[in-house]
């Protein structure tokens, strides 16, 4: 991929063609989703009323449909326009000289220099829970920024993403800290809207058959298409919506869910302190998600403090555009996160026990070595 990009940079025609293709690729899902939603609203407003006898019922259905349509459109474009957020948005997280920082990183155990290099912000040093093995705090060599907890580099977006969940081609953007709320709302709105259309069109088709209307009338193909598509989308989107709500209540991202499921990071780094001992001396696993604050607190941390923010697509996070300094909003910026103090205390306790055990084993090995040397003499 890098080779192709280098070749294209030398040829303006290929570079222009590549830019146009990328633009069309990102434009297509936006146009497609907008047209499908608008077409479904057209069917609801201008075709379905022809099969409903009561004008009052038709008006009520139209109001509900328009409301759901507007919510779908607003949440869809808020996902795109607000974006997920990136460490690059915060000047404090930028590394001025990456090579110097790597060579002089005071948090690197292999460092022998006393002169420190670039340091992460103080708030990040205080609150960071995940460190990169023996190499200290995480940083991205491609973006030249410090990587806060739960952030990852997205190859599709070409930059690091705050609390990255996944890259979604239907929006041509990443789902992350700032737009995850709107992603959940969009899935919920679309699922409700699709079930709403399916029930209405299904009832019309049922009456059309049972009342023998097919003998004198022709059923609109648009209505049949809405029936089929709304049912298919309702099932698919409902599954995604429920899964996203589940992850939200667990305070997990899709990446963290997969890492936890497949143990991607490995036993050596993450599993050493994920257990405790009961009164009988048996080992049992503890909750490994240090960001799990409980269902309601997890939900509020993403969806906002009250039911109004839960229902309406209202921004509840603090973006770098409104408050550029991380310290101005300590736990609502995608850089620092609240942790479960009980789980954190268990981690510390188990780490201390592990350290004591290592010291005892080291002392025992030293004693055995001295005894062997004494016996040899």
Curated annotation (Swiss-Prot):
Subcellular location field: Vacuole membrane
Topological domain spans for side Lumenal: 53-62, 203-222
UniProt membrane topology term: Multi-pass membrane protein
Catalytic activity from the UniProt record: L-cysteinyl-[protein] + hexadecanoyl-CoA = S-hexadecanoyl-L-cysteinyl-[protein] + CoA
Gene Ontology biological-process entries: protein targeting to membrane
EC number(s) from the headed UniProt entry: 2.3.1.225
Domain remark from Swiss-Prot or TrEMBL: The DHHC domain is required for palmitoyltransferase activity.
Protein's name according to its UniProt entry: Palmitoyltransferase PFA3
Upper lineage: Eukaryota, Fungi, Dikarya, Ascomycota, Saccharomycotina
């Amino acid at each position: 991929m890098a080779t192709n990009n280098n070749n294209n940079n030398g040829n303006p025609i290929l570079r222009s063609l590549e830019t146009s293709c990328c633009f069309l690729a990102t434009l297509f899902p936006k146009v497609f989703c907008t047209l499908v939603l608008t077409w479904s609203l057209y069917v609801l407003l201008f075709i379905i009323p022809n099969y409903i006898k009561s004008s009052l019922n038709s008006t009520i259905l139209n109001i509900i449909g328009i409301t759901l349509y507007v919510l779908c459109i607003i949440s869809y474009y808020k996902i795109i326009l607000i974006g997920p957020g990136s460490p690059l948005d915060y000047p404090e997280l930028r590394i001025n000289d990456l090579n110097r920082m790597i060579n002089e990183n005071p948090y690197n155990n292999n460092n022998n220099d006393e002169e420190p290099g670039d340091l992460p912000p103080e708030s990040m040093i205080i609150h960071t829970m995940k460190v990169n093995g023996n190499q200290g705090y995480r940083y991205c060599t491609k973006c030249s920024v410090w990587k806060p907890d739960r952030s990852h580099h997205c190859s599709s977006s070409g930059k690091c993403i705050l609390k990255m969940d996944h890259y979604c081609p239907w929006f041509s953007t990443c789902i992350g800290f700032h737009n995850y709320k709107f992603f959940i709302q969009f899935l919920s709105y679309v699922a409700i809207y699709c079930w709403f259309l399916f029930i209405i069109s299904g009832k019309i088709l049922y009456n059309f058959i049972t009342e023998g209307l097919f003998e004198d009338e022709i059923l609109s193909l648009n209505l049949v298409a809405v029936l089929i598509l709304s049912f298919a989308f309702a099932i698919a989107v409902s599954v995604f919506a429920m899964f996203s709500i589940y992850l939200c209540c667990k305070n997990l991202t899709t990446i963290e869910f997969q890492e936890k499921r497949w143990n991607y990071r490995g036993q050596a780094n993450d599993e050493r302190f994920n257990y405790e001992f009961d009164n009988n001396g048996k080992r049992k696993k503890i909750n490994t998600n240090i960001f799990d604050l409980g269902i309601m607190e997890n939900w509020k941390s993403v969806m906002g403090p009250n039911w109004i923010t839960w229902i309406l697509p209202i921004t509840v996070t603090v973006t770098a555009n409104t408050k550029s300094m991380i310290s101005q909003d300590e736990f609502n910026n995608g850089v620092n996160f609240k942790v479960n103090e009980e789980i954190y205390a268990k981690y510390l306790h188990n780490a201390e026990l592990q350290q004591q055990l290592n010291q005892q084993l080291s002392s025992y090995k030293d004693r055995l070595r001295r005894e062997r040397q004494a016996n040899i003499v």
